[in-house]
Amino acid sequence: MTIAEHDNVFIFVPNLIGYARIVLALIAFWFMSTNYVISGWCYVTSALLDAVDGQAARAFNQSTRFGAMLDQLTDRCGTTGLLVTLAYFYPRYMFWFQLSIAIDVACHWLFMQTSVVVGRSSHKVNDNFIMRLYYQKDILTFMCCVNELFYVCLYLLHFTYGPLIFGASLFKILAFLTGPFAVLKALISVMHAYVAGIDLAAVDVRERQERRQKSEPVSGKKVE
C-alpha cells in the first residue's frame, strides 16, 4: 500500500519529535549511572518535549493514534528506566520503586487498551468525572511535571545536593514538596485501571448478551 506524503503518519512533525524523545531517553539511560549531567539534561529534555509534540499535533492538525501510542510508550519506558536506576541507587526502597513501575505500566496499558476496544477517539476522552478533570490540559501538565521532578530530584541527590537554600539542599526540598503529588499520581493511575476495568467488563457483558441472542431460536419458528 502506497502512502501519500501528506498521510504518512511516520513523518508527521509530532512523531518526529517523538523519535527525538526516544533517542534522548536512550542517551539518558546510557549515562544514568555514571554521568548525571548528561543523563539529567537528556532525560529532562525528553520529558519536556512531551508537551511540545502535543502542541505540534494540534498546530499542524497531525493528531494520530500512532502518535498517541508512541507518546504513551515513550513516557512509560522513560519513567521505568529512571525508576530502575533509583531502585539500584536506593536498594532500601526498591519495593516502592518496583511498585511504582508496576502501577504506572499496568494501569496505563489497561486504560489505553480499553480506549481502543471501546472505540474512543482518544484515551483522554472519558465519561468518568475524575478522568475528565485529570485530563484537563493544565492539571495533566502539572501532575506530570511534578511527578517527573520528584524522581529526577531523587536521582540527582544520589550524586549531589545541588544549590543550598538557607543551608538546605534545593533538590531535597523539591523532593519533599513534589513527593505527595507523585503518590497522588500513582493513586490516579490506579483509578485509571478501575475505570478501564468497569468499561471493559461492560463490553464483555454486551458481547455475551449479543452471543446469547444469536444462539437463541427465533420466536415463532419451529426448532428442528
From Swiss-Prot:
Q: Could you say which residues bind a CDP-1,2-diacyl-sn-glycerol here?
A: G54, R58, T64
Which residues lie toward the Lumenal compartment?
A: 30-35, 98, 160-163
Active site residues per record: D75 (proton acceptor)
Positions annotated to bind Mg(2+) 1: D50, D53, D71
Q: Which residues bind Mg(2+) 2?
A: D50, D71, D75
Q: What class of enzyme is it?
A: transferase
Cofactor(s) needed, names only, are:
Mn(2+); Mg(2+)
Q: Its topology with respect to the membrane?
A: Multi-pass membrane protein
* Cytoplasmic topology ranges: 1-8, 53-76, 120-138, 185-224
Q: Which keywords does UniProt give here?
A: Cell membrane, Lipid biosynthesis, Lipid metabolism, Magnesium, Manganese, Membrane, Metal-binding, Phospholipid biosynthesis, Phospholipid metabolism, Transferase, Transmembrane, Transmembrane helix
Q: Which PROSITE patterns match?
A: CDP_ALCOHOL_P_TRANSF (PS00379)
Please, which domain of life does this record's source organism belong to? Eukaryota
Give the GO biological process terms. Answer: basement membrane organization; phosphatidylinositol biosynthetic process; phototransduction
User: What is catalysed by this protein?
Assistant: a CDP-1,2-diacyl-sn-glycerol + myo-inositol = a 1,2-diacyl-sn-glycero-3-phospho-(1D-myo-inositol) + CMP + H(+)
Tell me if Magnesium is a UniProt keyword of this record: yes
Q: Where in the cell is it found?
A: Apical cell membrane; Lateral cell membrane
**Record InterPro entries:** CDP-OH_P_trans (IPR000462), CDP-OH_PTrfase_TM_dom (IPR043130), CDP_ALCOHOL_P_TRANSF_CS (IPR048254), CDP_diag_ino_3_P_euk (IPR014387)
Family (UniProt):
Belongs to the CDP-alcohol phosphatidyltransferase class-I family.
Protein name according to UniProt:
CDP-diacylglycerol--inositol 3-phosphatidyltransferase
What species does this protein belong to?
A: Drosophila melanogaster
